[in-house]
């Protein structure tokens, strides 16, 4: 079986070759923690890392409100235009799918491995941005449900 260090080095190389600084940096930080005997922080990082990442993502998205680049005048069209209503629906659907993804991960936690590898493939080969393992799980849950509906017919 491949050791954690080797896997992290492989991820660093994949990140560098694929021009994905996020993967390379994340794997590098984990490798440093592992090599400096700070592995005791892994459970905390695993448990709280996603929350912290989402917190910073949300902060970055809300900066235009705080800096007053977006005003109430800009928010009103959300409720009166097709684009605005579609954005609201998209947000609601994404949130619902995240919930389905969480349900899937709770019932089948081993799927996280496929989601991580799929995310790496998406980052490296499709220039994707890894913002949501829950969304990836939600999409997986949706596709599995479609498979269940149409595959059984």
UniProtKB/Swiss-Prot annotation:
Keywords: Cell membrane, Membrane, Transmembrane, Transmembrane helix. It is a multi-pass membrane protein. The chain crosses the membrane at residues 6-26, 52-72, 77-97, 111-131, 132-152. Belongs to the UPF0756 family. One of its GO terms (cellular component) is plasma membrane. Its main location: membrane. It is found in: Cell membrane. Coiled coil: none annotated. The keyword Amino-acid biosynthesis does not apply. The keyword Transmembrane applies. This is UPF0756 membrane protein BBR47_23170.
């Amino acid at each position: 079986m491949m050791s954690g260090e080797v896997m992290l080095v492989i991820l660093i190389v994949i990140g560098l070759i694929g021009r994905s600084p996020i993967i390379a940096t994340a794997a590098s930080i984990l490798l440093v923690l592992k090599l400096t005997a700070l592995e005791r922080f892994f459970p905390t990082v695993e448990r709280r890392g996603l929350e912290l990442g989402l917190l910073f993502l949300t902060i970055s998205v809300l900066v235009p409100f705080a800096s007053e680049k977006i005003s109430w005048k800009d928010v009103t069209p959300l409720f009166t235009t097709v684009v605005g209503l579609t954005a609201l629906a998209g947000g609601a659907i994404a949130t619902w799918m995240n919930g389905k993804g969480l349900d899937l991960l709770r019932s089948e936690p081993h799927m996280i491995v496929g989601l991580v590898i799929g995310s790496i493939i998406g980052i490296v080969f499709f220039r994707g941005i890894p913002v949501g393992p829950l969304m990836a799980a939600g999409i997986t849950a949706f596709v599995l449900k479609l498979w269940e509906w149409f595959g059984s017919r």
